[in-house]
């Protein structure tokens, strides 16, 4: 199993979630976050914004589905501009469902 953390532009998130859902990847968590990447914030007129609002999607999925999910996120979230986002992949050793106390996804 793998965990995907995708940090994306807020205005692209619903489109990404819909695309993932249409491909059968429906289980995820969304969180509003703030942060910055290599661009170190943004200047608009005389105002400098050190950190920008983003949304983080968390998905835990079987390892064999990773490439499909990454492709969907990359294709759907892409604008070609700074701040499109980042995708991080981590291993997940185990997962449990609290309601059923079952192990696995």
Curated annotation (Swiss-Prot):
Gene Ontology CC annotations of this record: cytosol
InterPro entries for this protein: N-reg_PII, N-reg_PII-like_a/b, N-reg_PII/ATP_PRibTrfase_C, N-reg_PII_CS
Record's function text: Could be involved in the regulation of nitrogen fixation.
Organism of origin: Methanobacterium ivanovii
Molecular function in Gene Ontology: ATP binding; enzyme regulator activity
Name listed for the protein in its UniProt record: Nitrogen fixation nifHD region GlnB-like protein 1
Pfam family, one: P-II
A biological process term (GO) from this entry: regulation of nitrogen utilization
UniProt KW keywords: Nitrogen fixation, Transcription, Transcription regulation
Keyword Transcription regulation applies: yes
Entry-linked SMART domains: P-II
Gene3D superfamilies: 3.30.70.120
Annotated family: Belongs to the P(II) protein family.
Domain of life, source organism: Archaea
